[in-house]
Amino acid sequence: MTKVLHLSHHYGCLKDHQYVCDKLGLDLTNKLSIWNDIIKRDVYCITREIANSTWKEHKDYFNSFDFIITSDTAPLSRIFLENIDEFKGQLIVWVCNRFNYEMHDDDAYLTLMSESVGKDNVKIIPYTKFETMWAEAYKVKFTEEVIRPIGVSIDKPLSENEDLGLIGFGGDYGDELKGGDLLVSRYHNDTLWQDSVKMMEHYDLSADPCKYRGYKGLVELAKKYEAYFILPEQYSKFAAFELMNIGLPVILPSEDFLFHLSSANNYWFGSGLYKNTTEVCEWYNEYYDQFALYIDDFEEIPETFKIVKEHKKKIRGIMKKCAKEHQSKTLDQWRKIYNV
């Protein structure tokens, strides 16, 4: 069985790819930085010294795998790129949060990434089109096609020693939520830029902040609500694909309205939103174009919610079709990468 090691700072990346590896019949080992196992917690700037010392300490272990994949953040790949001539396996760099996160001033790293593109045992794979656009701004040209999150996970620990309390899942994650009309994103724009829950109450709609423990928690929570509302703050979110798979209708600003909102004081959007990049945000991808309910003004929310109520079965049917298509395509993409 093909052996795969996945290193990441991001629990969601590990869970998403765990599903992929399970479906493809791969023998997967996960390492999350918060466990302080191989990679250290909160160490995002991977210098050449850190990369080489980590490689030296774990070289034999690393070479026991057929594939090693790194995800959020991409600089973890430096451990292997600096020592690629000694690495016996295949390296996959799944770029999930800007390839140069915390590495902007390290010219040697930028050169290393650029020179690694196209190597026989290296595949640098963006998880959304914006990652390619961002890299090109730094004269790094990715050649692999985008492979997006599949948006599903399995109810299985990442590791025998997994402790969800260590990654924040022991805190306030919505166990008390009874249900209502709308689940609202719990991130900056819906809580600090404005209070979207209160806005829904102004429109006589019941709403709660979307708090849950992983994919399974979202599946259960979604059963209690009619729709989900978000003011986007990233080009891609695992939640965008999870909501599609679960079949919870999504209400959000149109591209033009989002661009207008993004210019407001204190509205946050990761890496900035520009007129020519709004369209590559995954909340407006070819799937969401078929089922999302876009608004051009907050005043449209009550009528839009009414449409959800009246046509929920049809909307969910479209979401189910899109989810099936997306899962099939994504698994085929990874199947080619792993040659299985």
Predicted regions and their residues:
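N-terminal pre-catalytic "stem/leader" segment of glycosyltransferase-like enzymes
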Residues: 1-86, 332-340
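Structural motif
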Residues: 6-12, 32-35, 69-75, 94-99, ...
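Catalytic core of nucleotide-activated saccharide and alditol-phosphate transferases
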Residues: 73-178
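Conserved catalytic-core segment of nucleotide-activated headgroup transferases in glycan assembly
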Residues: 150-218
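Short acidic alpha-helix that forms the nucleotide-activated donor recognition element
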Residues: 214-225, 245
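A short hydrophobic beta-strand element within the catalytic core of glycosyltransferases
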Residues: 228-229
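Catalytic binding pocket for nucleotide-activated donors in carbohydrate/polymer assembly enzymes
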Residues: 232-233, 237-325
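C-terminal alpha-helical cap of glycosyltransferases
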Residues: 304-307, 324-340
